[in-house]
Amino acid sequence: MAALVALCSGIGRKNLTTAAGCFTDRGTQAVSVIWRRCFSQFEQVTSNEDLPVPMENPYKEPLKKCVLCEKRVDYKNVQLLSQFISPFTGCIYGRHITGLCGKKQREITKAIKRAQKMGFMPVTYKDPAYLKDPRVCNIRYRE
């Protein structure tokens, strides 16, 4: 029994890979159990049949691209700028509505303000000439 305690006291050490224990069943025959840390009783699989198949993520949404990232925004292009203001109040739509990136949203806002100050665009409403233009963004108006 002292040999068993001496052997099992070293189980916590990192370099020990084998441990043996003796168990007796009512004083009859001793059974020894051998445990090895990095070994299993099954053979290692050398083929790739159990590995997962590499594939694209089917739930990944396509990246949203900014509509105006490759375009130049000018304060004199009133028809383009009027797409980003409300037809009823003249308020500039935010990023969550227009879907623009932050840089282009700032450029659009500055261009609209500049066009309104210079008299190219009305301030309080959208110009009626541009009400039936095709929409650049997915902006839904109440009807």
UniProtKB/Swiss-Prot annotation:
GO terms for molecular function: structural constituent of ribosome. InterPro entries: Ribosomal_bS18, Ribosomal_bS18_CS, Ribosomal_bS18_sf. Gene3D superfamilies: Ribosomal protein S18. GO terms for cellular component: mitochondrial inner membrane; mitochondrial small ribosomal subunit; mitochondrion. GO terms for biological process: mitochondrial translation. It comes from the Eukaryota. It is found in: Mitochondrion. Keywords: Mitochondrion, Ribonucleoprotein, Ribosomal protein, Transit peptide. Coiled coil: none annotated. Its main location: mitochondrion. PANTHER family: 30S RIBOSOMAL PROTEIN S18, SMALL RIBOSOMAL SUBUNIT PROTEIN BS18M. Belongs to the bacterial ribosomal protein bS18 family. Component of the mitochondrial ribosome small subunit (28S) which comprises a 12S rRNA and about 30 distinct proteins. This is Small ribosomal subunit protein bS18m. It comes from Mus musculus (Mouse).
